Amino acid sequence: MAKISRIIGREILDSRGNPTVEADVYLESGAMGRAAAPSGASTGSREALELRDGDKSRYLGKGVTKAVAAINDTISPALLGKDALAQADIDGIMIDLDGTENKETLGANAILAVSLAVAKAAAAEKGVALYEHIADLNGTSGQYSMPVPMMNIINGGEHADNNVDIQEFMVQPVGAKSFKEALRMGAEIFHALKKVLSAKGLNTAVGDEGGFAPNLSSNAEALAVIVEAVENAGYKMNEDITLALDCAASEFYKEGKYVLSGEDKSFDSEAFGDYLADLSAQYPIVSIEDGLDESDWDGWASLTKKIGDKVQLVGDDLFVTNTKILKRGIDNGIGNSILIKFNQIGSLTETLNAIKMAKDAGFTAVISHRSGETEDATIADLAVGTAAGQIKTGSLCRSDRVAKYNQLLRIEEALGDAATYKGRSEIKGQ
């Protein structure tokens, strides 16, 4: 038994300069784990609650002293003496302590930080890497795979101050033979894209996730400049590199219409599905996340019938890493993939349950960061330990993004031949 001896919560800053919650968990043996909760910008309405103070005189109301107090005053006394190796029990105690469906009493940010710190302390107690401990918890011991990265190199929507409506334009180095090679390919394309944008007189400042945020005439132009950059970097579209979108469509869904204000266009649900189908026919787009609003289930069903056999349709705001909502989606033929963000649900155990449910149903699971991140690289270990197959953790700059890529490099090196990089076959429909 690895008894918890001390838990400390504190307020730290995330990559956007906003406060977030960090937790330290100490065991009687001296083993220790530390983890921080991330924070999103475009959030699904059904996400677990991120507890903020609301005191406008401090951090513009975004302080997290209430969540920190929940750790120090409520969670800590309940977990002292408990076994850190029993992750499901630990998470269950915190969920019961909170007592609400969306974790609004203690805050998902408080519960998650402790949940992840407990897992890290348990890994330290066992003397194993975090991905190995996660694999043990997940029942996937020894079944490791290196994830195909979705690299967000052009930002729009809620992640940037520009006129591009689609939130993320991503490249996937599917033709790489290893994660190390995939990362190099992505970095070379990122630098090539900067040159392409500069040559066109476009802005090369970056958004929250490290991608460029230029003003472009259309979403199609964003795809065109990426294709140019890929080719300039010496790679072949659809062979070495495929494309992925995160529309974050709930952000531009207004009164039953999908409004692309940057292009001065408006679509009903069926027509916007056709728009996405056309884009994926013109370009090698093999994955579309949140292509429709989180409440537009009829539209999602139609889009899934339309292109779900050849394009990965990822539910983020749609499913919010929640098994109850995911089950409805599976039962009703909605999408074919889930985005996994552990702060949407608020504990490691519930996150693992969502990944398992998705995989058992033939869905893919894409492990994801949030736009507000820290140096915490737990999602890298989560992706490898669950053999999820895909990860989305931003562009090829900003330390909060690169921290995850660097951790994946270390894991691949440590695993050696056991680290398989399967490339294109990890993506649903490919």
Swiss-Prot record:
InterPro entries: Enolase, Enolase-like_C_sf, Enolase-like_N, Enolase_C, Enolase_CS, Enolase_N
Organism: Alteromonas mediterranea (strain DSM 17117 / CIP 110805 / LMG 28347 / Deep ecotype)
Coiled-coil annotated residue ranges, if any: none
Location relative to the cell: Cytoplasm; Secreted; Cell surface
UniProt-annotated binding residues for Mg(2+): 246, 289, 316
Family per similarity comment: Belongs to the enolase family.
Residues annotated as catalytic: 209 (proton donor), 341 (proton acceptor)
Protein name: Enolase
Family matches, as SMART domains: Enolase_C, Enolase_N
Any GO CC annotation of this UniProt entry: cell surface
UniProt pathway annotation: Carbohydrate degradation; glycolysis; pyruvate from D-glyceraldehyde 3-phosphate: step 4/5
Highest rank taxon of the organism: Bacteria
